[in-house]
Amino acid sequence: MDSTMTPEPKEPQGPWRWLMDSEEVSSSLLRSSIEQFASLEAYTSKYGDMVDMIGYPYLSRVWQVDPNGKPYSFQQRCLVITDVHSPYYAYTIAKLPEYALIVTGVTAPNFGMEGGAREVRFIYGGELLTVAECAELGILKGRSLS
């Protein structure tokens, strides 16, 4: 191409393609797997009280940890590659204030990864809470990994 030619613009292609909401997916969760709990006891009797996250407390997603303490893999969480250097946090769900909800569902496959991790989010007064806000409200308590 000579210097007088201008290349045709191309559709922007970011390094990651986030899942769009669809009939099958809502906010990166499989719609068929989404459950909502207004009771901590109802949630913990089904899934336990241990959660963790890869990322920073200003984010709002944590993942369920199995009763033996085994966390989901990076691929099951469908995290972007830059999260490989993000910190790891472990928590116990300690309480659920009145009018708060736990919303949980299975992560949909994305970024060429399998998905399948059970993601957990906390809603209070209709607002999605960050992990830092959950800690301030006493919903989440840090736990030791030993």
Task: Describe the residue ranges of each PLM region.
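ADP-ribose/NAD+-binding catalytic cleft of ART/PARP-like enzymes
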Residues: 1-80
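Acidic, aromatic-enriched beta-alpha/helix-loop junctions
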Residues: 74-93
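Active-site and NAD+-binding cores of ADP-ribose-processing enzymes
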Residues: 87-146
